[in-house]
Design a protein with these regions (language model features):
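A polyanion-binding, active-site-adjacent surface
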Residues: 1-144
């Protein structure tokens, strides 16, 4: 909240390294959260909070109109893909999804905060990142 930007601290530093590993950075991607504020005690957002902010998230996606969407963590996955989906089963798989008026390719991976707590899972995220790099190439997306 002090910084006013998503993914700061150790999780943000790890996210920056993850992006850099596939030749991306915060200047050529758009990063946001499911809700636009930090919950008390950094708890998982309630269903009411998610429902209240989902129209804003959808509008962000429509405005940015990305070709690829990377969901980091179960909150993003369950909000945008489905609430019964388990991240360990969903990660590393492409899904074509319509969000608002935007049709895009969606892939899920582990949240950087989870990877800090479970560093053995970084190898799975590396696989996901390589899939993103490949999809960028396949879709001929120009990165500035």
């Amino acid at each position: 909240d002090k910084e006013g930007i998503p993914f700061v601290g150790r999780a943000g530093q790890l996210l920056d390294k993850m992006l850099e590993s596939i030749n991306l950075n915060r200047d050529n991607v758009y990063i946001t959260n499911v809700i636009n504020f930090r919950t008390p005690d950094n708890r998982k957002p309630s269903s009411e909070e998610i429902e209240r902010y989902l129209p804003y998230l959808t509008k962000h996606i429509e405005i940015i109109s990305p070709k690829i969407l990377l969901l980091l963590g179960s909150t993003a996955l369950n909000t945008l893909i489905g609430d019964k989906i388990v991240i360990s089963e969903a990660r590393g798989k492409w899904v074509e999804k319509q969000i608002g008026n935007c049709k895009l390719f969606v892939i899920t991976s582990f949240h950087p905060a989870f990877l800090i707590r479970q560093p053995d899972q970084k190898k799975m995220s590396w696989i996901d990142l390589k899939m993103i790099r490949k999809k960028i190439f396949e879709l001929k997306i120009k990165i500035d």
